[in-house]
């Protein structure tokens, strides 16, 4: 946020500026623990994001908002209201549980009778869910995510090497040592 009113950058562009932003640019995290923490900046971000995606020509569209399973109905309603009040020409607004959206996004057959474990590690939360027969059998939102892992990396580097590193460097270290996909590592668990 530049000069407390204009969004200067968001997403990856904003992350590149993290820990390097000048004094007139404030880094904002409008979501915290899976819920809206800063409604004003979230509204501005939604407008900018949709405008960028549609190249300024906003046409009526269906909106599907993926939300954590363990949040309250009031918190879910806040996401719905955010889109409804954003004046983005929504034909339909659907709030869907994130675990189902994650499963579909990973091309998992969520309607299968065999249970599927989905673990979504986010910035400050981790959602662990078991999906079966098109629904969520069990889901828990844990208030620990990549940010806490990064802090653990920072503390370990400080303790072991007497070296201070920033959050972005810690995130890079975490991602390089914790990426299961690159080395083809995985696990099949029966029980």
Roles of regions detected by a PLM:
Residues 1-123, 130-191:
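Nucleotide/phosphate-binding catalytic cleft detector across ATP-hydrolyzing
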